[in-house]
Curated annotation (Swiss-Prot):
The protein's name: Small ribosomal subunit protein uS2
Source species: Lachnoclostridium phytofermentans (strain ATCC 700394 / DSM 18823 / ISDg)
Superkingdom field: Bacteria
Annotated InterPro entries: Ribosomal_uS2, Ribosomal_uS2_bac/mit/plastid, Ribosomal_uS2_CS, Ribosomal_uS2_flav_dom_sf
Keywords: Ribonucleoprotein, Ribosomal protein
GO-annotated molecular function: structural constituent of ribosome
Keyword Zinc belongs to the record: no
Family: Belongs to the universal ribosomal protein uS2 family.
GO biological process entries: translation
Length: 246
């Protein structure tokens, strides 16, 4: 039994690709037809690819690995954050800072600084510092939290990355390739599927479509940690549909 149904994918609009003039020929095998200048993705293939991605993530986590969820485009930001938090994994949803993987030691020093300021805010240090200094510290804190908040507990480079739109996240993809990190992600008809170890052909521009697939990947993490299959867990998918239709 598949972890997702064609009905769910259809209702979420996962089948809508890009305009035919904006495409990558390497995605041809995942395209079903063309309608009104838009490519329609073959959802039968997407169902199988969601399964592959699901079990790839489940396998990583079951073996003690960590997953980093990445999606900095507006349509992905909320679901990447909420689903990563739901399954207890890391995320980047604002901006990919160059070197987040390849220069992780430097990133760790910035995370250390973020935690130092958090401690100062919580232990009463802010109350005894000059007002001007506190304002500057709060500004620094806000910026660090925005860019690094989702990875502040990440102690090392993750074993796998789930990415929404590899074309948008090209720096992340390059760094993952350099370090041999497993890449799983949603690729629209304008992407290069060969950049990913496990590709899910689908609409990466619709909030509902992105939420549905990211939620399934979070389910894979939860199943690996709890040993319970979540193939019937459609609540998040339905919630995604309701949110868009509301």
């Amino acid at each position: 039994m598949s972890v997702i149904s064609m009905k769910q994918l259809l209702e979420a609009g996962v089948h809508f690709g890009h305009q035919t003039r904006r495409w990558n020929p390497k995605m041809a095998e995942y395209i079903y037809t063309e309608r009104n200048g838009i490519y329609i993705i073959d959802l039968q293939k997407s169902v199988g690819k969601v399964d592959e991605a699901y079990y790839a993530i489940k396998d990583v986590v079951a073996n003690g690995g960590k997953v980093l969820f990445v999606g900095t485009k507006k349509q992905a930001q909320d679901s990447v954050k909420s689903e990563a938090e739901r399954c207890g994994m890391y995320y980047v949803n604002e901006r990919w800072l160059g070197g987040m993987l390849t220069n992780f030691k430097t990133i760790q020093s910035r995370i250390k600084r973020l935690k130092e300021i958090e401690t100062m805010a919580n232990d009463g240090t802010f109350e005894v510092l000059p007002k001007k200094e506190v304002i500057e510290l709060k500004k620094e804190w806000e910026k660090l939290e925005k860019n690094l908040g989702g990875i502040k507990d990440m102690k090392e480079v993750p074993e796998a990355i789930f990415v929404v739109d590899p074309k948008k996240e090209r720096i992340c993809i390059q760094e993952a390739h350099n370090l041999g990190v497993k890449l799983i992600g949603i690729a629209d008809t304008n992407c290069d599927p060969e950049e990913l170890d496990h590709v899910i052909p689908g609409n990466d521009d619709a909030i509902r479509a992105v939420k549905l697939i990211v939620a399934k990947m979070a389910d894979a993490v939860i199943e690996a940690n709890q040993g319970v299959q979540l193939t019937d867990s459609t609540d998040v998918a339905e919630e995604a549909t309701e949110t868009v239709e509301a």
